[in-house]
C-alpha cells in the first residue's frame, strides 16, 4: 500500500506487481489511487501495473474517472492500468475508456454492491465473455475450491489477498468455524 512496500517487493520478487496507494480525502469515499498525486508516486516506483478505483463514485475534488484516466494515460502512455471495479457497469466503462485490465476488486464494497457474495461468479462469467479486456479476479477467494472455480472462467489472473495476508482475519475464520 506504499511506494516503499512496492520498491521492497520488486527487489525480492520477479513477478509483475500491482501497485495501489490508499489515500483518504474528506470529500470522497474513493481511496484506492484516487488522484494524479498517487498515480505519479506509483509510476515513479516502476511498478508494472497501477490499479485505481474505477467505480462511478465521486472522486476527490469533484474529479471524474474519465478525466483522471485520460490525464494518466497521456502522462504515462506505456504504463499498464488496472480498473478496480464493483460491478459489470464499472468494468464495461473501464474497458471502453481504455484500461488495460479490469478487476472485481470492489465488488461487495460499494453501496451499490454491498451484500453481494464474493467471489462474484456471475460477474466473472459476464465480464470474461462480454468484454474484450483481461480480467483479474479479486475479492473473497479463501478456499482452494473457490480459486478453482474462479479459474473455470477465462480470467487472466487471480489475486489472493486477505486469505493469506491478514493473520487476524485468518484466525477469526477458524474461531468462527468452531464456535
Question: What is the role of each PLM region?
Answer:
Residues 27-41, 86-98, 131-137, 141-158:
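Catalytic cores of alpha/beta
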Residues 69, 76-77, 151-162:
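Short, electropositive alpha-helical surface patch
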Residues 18-20, 100-107:
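Non-cysteine beta-strand/loop elements that form the S-adenosyl-L-methionine
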Residues 1-18, 29-36, 54-74, 88-93, ...:
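Active-site-adjacent beta->alpha loops and helix N-cap segments on the catalytic face
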Amino acid at each position: 500500500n506504499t511506494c516503499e512496500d512496492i520498491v521492497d517487493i520488486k527487489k525480492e520478487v520477479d513477478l509483475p506487481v500491482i501497485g495501489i496507494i490508499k489515500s483518504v480525502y474528506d470529500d470522497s469515499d474513493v481511496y484506492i489511487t484516487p488522484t494524479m498525486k498517487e498515480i505519479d508516486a506509483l509510476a515513479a516506483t516502476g511498478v508494472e501495473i497501477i490499479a485505481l478505483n474505477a467505480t462511478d463514485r465521486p472522486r476527490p475534488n469533484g474529479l471524474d474517472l474519465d478525466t483522471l484516466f485520460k490525464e494518466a494515460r497521456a502522462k504515462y502512455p506505456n504504463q499498464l492500468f488496472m480498473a478496480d471495479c464493483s460491478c459489470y457497469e464499472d468494468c464495461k466503462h473501464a474497458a471502453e475508456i481504455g484500461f488495460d485490465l479490469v478487476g472485481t476488486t470492489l465488488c461487495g464494497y460499494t453501496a451499490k454492491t454491498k451484500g453481494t457474495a464474493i467471489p462474484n461468479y456471475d460477474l466473472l462469467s459476464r465480464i470474461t465473455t462480454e468484454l474484450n479486456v483481461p480480467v483479474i479476479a479479486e475479492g473473497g477467494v479463501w478456499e482452494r475450491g473457490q480459486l478453482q472455480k474462479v479459474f473455470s472462467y477465462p480470467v487472466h489472473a487471480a489475486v489472493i489477498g486477505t486469505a493469506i495476508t491478514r493473520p487476524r482475519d485468518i484466525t477469526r475464520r477458524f474461531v468462527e468455524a468452531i464456535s
